[in-house]
From Swiss-Prot:
Catalytic activity: GTP + H2O = GDP + phosphate + H(+)
GO molecular function terms noted in the UniProt entry: GTP binding; hydrolase activity; metal ion binding; structural constituent of cytoskeleton
Positions that bind Mg(2+): D10
Function of the protein: Tubulin is the major constituent of microtubules, a cylinder consisting of laterally associated linear protofilaments composed ofalpha- and beta-tubulin heterodimers.
Protein name: Tubulin-like protein alpha-4B
Active-site positions on this chain: E193
Keywords carried by this UniProt record: Cytoplasm, Cytoskeleton, GTP-binding, Hydrolase, Magnesium, Metal-binding, Microtubule, Nucleotide-binding
GO biological process, alphabetically ordered: microtubule-based process
Species this chain originates from: Homo sapiens
Name of encoding gene: TUBA4B
Compartments where located: Cytoplasm, Cytoskeleton
């Protein structure tokens, strides 16, 4: 769980992973950056830019896999609306199925919303990427952009949520999902058990509707947590929208 591979072919986005607060988490050799923008075009990124980088990506992944004593699978974090997260990632997942067919692939997918859309082609990219996700992902956790904005605005009293607020909320969801891998427990001891315990039908890779996992626990603002009493029944009640 400690090895990461990060890819980015879009040079127009800020390189926060290289210069941000958490830059020391990622090894510099595992940060791959391209010089060409896919312009939010799924076909261009999937069939052109993706083919240019696939050998480099697979080589870096192979080196990380060789360092693992027992490779269980892959956790793929990506967005479905723009650039690298949709087109190149879907192409990479196809090759992961070819080279690591027996290894589990868990995807954490950020779905776009009309209220916070930044590109007109996001619906098209999402549909095309979803098809690949259904075919090559063993278990997919969907995160709705609008839902996390509503949680920050309505439940956490954040008037103008920043990317830091959104990422911290998503990190709490990922942390709760992977808790059984990091701590002792009876369920989900390894990645292969996620699909068995969470997916109802073999033809379905998504265990929950968008952001259902985040609704399992009530959220409190940072200002109210000092005086707000947190009884156990309130923590166990789901958040209603």
């Amino acid at each position: 769980m400690r090895h990461q591979q990060t890819e980015r072919q879009d040079p127009s986005q800020p390189l926060s992973r290289q210069h941000g607060t958490y830059r020391q988490i990622f090894h510099p050799e595992q940060l791959i950056t391209g010089k060409e923008d896919a312009a939010n075009n799924y076909a261009w990124g999937h069939y052109t830019i993706g083919k240019e980088f696939i050998d480099l990506l697979l080589d870096r992944i192979r080196k990380l896999a060789d360092q693992c004593t027992g490779l269980q699978g892959f956790l793929v974090f990506h967005s479905l609306g723009r650039g690298t997260g949709s087109d190149v990632t879907s192409f990479l997942m196809e090759w992961l199925s070819v080279n690591y067919g027996k290894k589990s692939k868990l995807g954490f997918s950020i779905y776009p919303a009309p209220q916070v859309s930044t590109a007109m082609v996001q619906p098209y990219n999402s549909i095309l990427t979803t098809h690949t996700t259904l075919e090559h992902s063993d278990c997919a956790f969907m995160v709705d952009n609008k839902a996390i904005y509503d949680i920050c605005h309505c439940n956490l009293d954040i008037e103008r949520p920043t990317y830091t607020n959104l990422n911290r909320l998503i990190s709490q969801i990922v942390s709760s999902i992977t808790a059984s891998l990091r701590f002792d427990g009876a369920l989900n001891v390894d990645l292969t058990e996620f699909q068995t315990n969470l997916v109802s039908y073999l033809t379905s890779t998504s265990p929950w509707p968008p952001m259902h996992q985040s609704s399992l626990q009530k959220r409190y603002t940072t200002s109210s947590c000092w005086w707000q009493r947190l009884p156990m029944p309130a923590l166990s009640l789901p958040t209603r929208w």
